[in-house]
Amino acid sequence: MASSTDVRPKITLACETCKHRNYITKKNRRNDPDRLEIKKFCPNCGSHQPHKESR
């Protein structure tokens, strides 16, 4: 299956304010070695909030 050294692993994005895990996406480890942070819409908060990569 997927190894831990996969170049494009699946990650979960969690809202910064309410901590709900709203989005699942993939990222390229070579281009983005740090934890990803994107501003996306949170349906629980009802507004655009920063979402961070959760473990």
Swiss-Prot record:
Gene Ontology biological process terms, A to Z: translation
Annotated signal peptide: none
Any one Gene Ontology cellular component term annotated for this protein: cytoplasm
Keywords (A to Z) from UniProt: Ribonucleoprotein, Ribosomal protein
Annotated PROSITE patterns: RIBOSOMAL_L33
GO molecular function annotations of the record: structural constituent of ribosome
Entry-linked InterPro entries: Ribosomal_bL33, Ribosomal_bL33_CS, Ribosomal_bL33_sf, Ribosomal_zn-bd
Homology family: Belongs to the bacterial ribosomal protein bL33 family.
Name of the protein described by the UniProt record: Large ribosomal subunit protein bL33B
Gene name in the database record: rpmG2
